[in-house]
Swiss-Prot record:
Name of this protein: Myrcene synthase TPS3FN, chloroplastic
Family: Belongs to the terpene synthase family. Tpsb subfamily.
Catalysed transformations (reactions): (2E)-geranyl diphosphate = beta-myrcene + diphosphate
Note on domains (UniProt): The Asp-Asp-Xaa-Xaa-Asp/Glu (DDXXD/E) motif is important for the catalytic activity, presumably through binding to Mg(2+).
Cross-referenced Pfam families: Terpene_synth, Terpene_synth_C
Compartment list: Plastid, Chloroplast
Lineage: Eukaryota, Viridiplantae, Streptophyta, Embryophyta, Tracheophyta
Amino acid sequence: MHCMAVHQFSPSIVSSLPTISTYNNNHFCRFFTPKTSISPISKTKSKSSTCYPIQCTVVNNSSPSSTIVRRSANYEPPIWSFDYIQSLSTQYKGESYTRQLNKLKKEVKRMLLRMEINSLALLELIDTLQRLGISYHFKNEINTILKKKYNDNYINNNIITNPNYNNLYATALEFRLLRQHGYTVPQEIFNAFKDKRGKFKTSLSDDIMGVLCLYEASFYAMKHENILEEARIFSTKCLKKYMEKIENEEEKKILLLNDNNINSNLLLINHAFELPLHWRITRSEARWFIDEIYEKKQDMNSTLFEFAKLDFNIVQSTHQEDLQHLSRWWRDCKLGGKLNFARDRLMEAFLWDVGLKFEGEFSYFRRTNARLFVLITIIDDIYDVYGTLEELELFTSAVERWDVKLINELPDYMKMPFFVLHNTINEMGFDVLVEQNFVNIEYLKKSWVDLCKCYLQEAKWYYSGYQPTLEEYTELGWLSIGASVILMHAYFCFTNPITKQDLKSLQLQHHYPNIIKQACLITRLADDLGTSSDELNRGDVPKSIQCYMYDNNATEDEAREHIKFLISETWKDMNKKDEDESCLSENFVEVCKNMARTALFIYENGDGHGSQNSLSKERISTLIITPINIPK
């Protein structure tokens, strides 16, 4: 088990839901143009639903039996059985593979340390290590190199004498790597590539890899960094024109005379347009880069390639062990399959945790945190699909009072979920007690109280037919997505030891640091982009897309573009290191950012969590099940 921590939570959110002011009033308001406020009744709209009603009898000790017509989302049962998960096996275990990996690691380390500090090759090597998913092995070495480069170029003002000063590719690559590692490199470095009119030089379009690097670097922009905004617009236009040329056979022939990497370039550009590097999870990027790009590169290094493939497979074997441990827990708690109206998505829940923290040493975090994803999914479906308002109020009250004796006051179908939730959180609290001699049950519980109260408020919107504004929706939605529960648990895992300063800092931040709120908001908006149509068909409350359409009389396409804009703007907030992050561990901050990245990955092409489509199956297979082929 790794580091733990503590913090106190905000007051109850039932009567005073987390208002914009507890986050950053301007963060939400500046993006919304809601209509003049009108009463809930006048905003009521009829709800269309393709959900099928279920007629059933619910036994509740506090009331007579009654027949209730319920909704059903008709979720498919899980395709990954317990027996299949337990049968997963890989050869990449044992000391022989570990010895081989360590030998390759030493060779790569020597390669990294003997390079000239100002060489472009050193920057490219660091970038390659990151894209292959193996840079975590050389964290200290990379940090030392980048710190020296930053001090030499920006503290000692030697940037102009740097041999790569007028090289767009080298400048953009260095900028991205330094910003990624927390160095506030000034955006003005790109003024060297502008003409007398203050526009990026058109001749830069001839350096297509430099333009692609500029595009990737622009996603490290913070608010009001206009040069980086201009860089993104310029690079996007250049890259699109390049792609158009490739589609023209005559133009393509001309390009081939000067560049043999056109196919590779096209793959990289399309990949960047789907999601920029900064927004991607490490594990998925590593598998893609290994499978599709690196082996075909003219400068491919066989030692790096062998090391990356072996490391991927060894870590994957650890993930399989973690998954099997989780699967046994799920079987033993006997909740899976009991609630036929809810999503049973154990494998998908574990995929989230691979996105949050993939390194082999963090098994405890993955094994416990994935339980929360499973429980959030089940309880979300209780509130969204099945429960009556009266039952949901009972469940919310039971979570708030946190007394297992209250189980007899709940309907039968709620008893098992509440009991499993109660036991799971208490067990996690026990782990913290053993590790740090601190009782944190109240803090873990409070995150669930906040979540359930948000769920309840959304249920009230549904039953009253209320149409929230986008502002109202996001005030609630950043919490109701459930990511805050995950990140609170992560905070306890990655802050060790817990100090009084940690507690004081969190209290001053209204108990949810900005980086948590930012990550949760991106998760909510990404979820809405991927699932809102399906959820509306199931009869759920309007999501951010529909709220924006209602507020602004906009089309769905216009609303989707605005939600993407909100995601981009929220990333700018996350790119800026707040003062409140000073008390947060580096691992925890990275998990928060990885939450946003994983959400964008999961919902990139639809509902990758609830829907068991071919794409989600393929992703699970490549990341968790199928090792990379390594010829003997």
